[in-house]
């Protein structure tokens, strides 16, 4: 049969040889996919991601003399399976490149009877970074109208609780 590399092997190859952002995004997406990440079951999802990370690091351990070894190790350690898509992973890459404090994906914020999940959160600063995608609002006019109302209510609740929400658009990741 045709021999192919596993997703974990592919991530290790990418982290060793490709551009750091692209490799980081790939590592996040593989973790997300293989873990079946579910924000409503964060403990189990994060545990599965850590198992996948250990597999990636073990695979990387087979290449200790590669010139990109230390960079690959850092990328794998920084990857996060809580990113739902390539855009979120790209934004996370930028944040982790600029900020050394705690960064958490799919961070639950409880306000009254509501639980909101911040896509990318700097909890110590009470900052939520939300990569904006049109798909979050729906596929037709009625869904967009309903979801826009929910979004405005969410924004109001978060702001009143002292959270600052920063919106990121795809073109913000170009540089």
Which residues make up each language-model segment?
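Short gly/ser-rich loop at a beta-strand->alpha-helix junction or flexible surface loop bordering the NTP-binding
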Residues: 1-68
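Surface segments flanking catalytic/ligand-binding clefts of nucleic-acid enzymes
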Residues: 45-175
């Amino acid at each position: 049969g045709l021999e192919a590399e596993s997703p974990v092997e592919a991530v290790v190859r990418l982290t060793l040889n490709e551009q750091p952002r692209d490799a980081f995004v790939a590592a996040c997406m593989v973790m997300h996919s293989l873990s079946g990440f579910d924000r409503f079951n964060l403990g189990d999802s994060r545990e599965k991601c850590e198992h996948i990370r250990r597999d990636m690091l073990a695979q990387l351990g087979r290449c200790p003399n590669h010139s990109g070894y230390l960079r690959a190790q850092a990328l794998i350690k920084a990857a996060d399976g809580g990113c739902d898509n390539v855009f979120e992973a790209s934004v996370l890459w930028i944040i982790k490149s600029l900020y050394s404090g705690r960064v958490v994906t799919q961070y639950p914020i409880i306000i009254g009877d509501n639980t909101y999940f911040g896509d990318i959160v700097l909890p110590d600063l009470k900052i939520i970074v939300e990569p904006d995608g049109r798909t979050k609002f729906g596929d037709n006019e009625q869904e967009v109208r309903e979801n826009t109302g929910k979004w405005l209510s969410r924004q109001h609740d978060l702001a009143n609780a002292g959270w600052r929400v920063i919106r990121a658009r795809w073109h913000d990741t170009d540089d």
